[in-house]
């Protein structure tokens, strides 16, 4: 499957999918399925999780998990809301989706407040624009787009804040490969070195 990563990135980088398909088929369907099937903890951690489940220490809920605060925490799956669990402690152990509007990063927050950066949006015909969660950048150069959607000449962003334009931005480079993220870093460095200040 990893052999498909670069062709998929090519499709994304060259905007070869209609925005509606990009939203529903890629970001909302394929990406979660890919994450579930091909990205995850090592086998040993899964075995440890299964042991905790079998011991009754850990319970996995179904989709659309909801947490409410009554006298204690109450959690349940919206699809199976007849089974509810109560606890005095709650541990959140999921990786949230990328969302620049919800970032806790003080630098990104300040750039957002100062309107130097803004969220990337997909324009979908007959729909409200879809915010991908990424910072608006030029997908080819990774230059940050200003309020007028023109790239800043020397302001770049790559990696996790661009997830929603690029894909698998948190993936680590594997030895012996021409890793996408290292190519992007090289491209940005070369652009900066050739820029006249």
Regions from the language model: what does each represent?
Residues 1-196:
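Flavin (primarily FAD) cofactor-binding/catalytic cores of flavoenzymes
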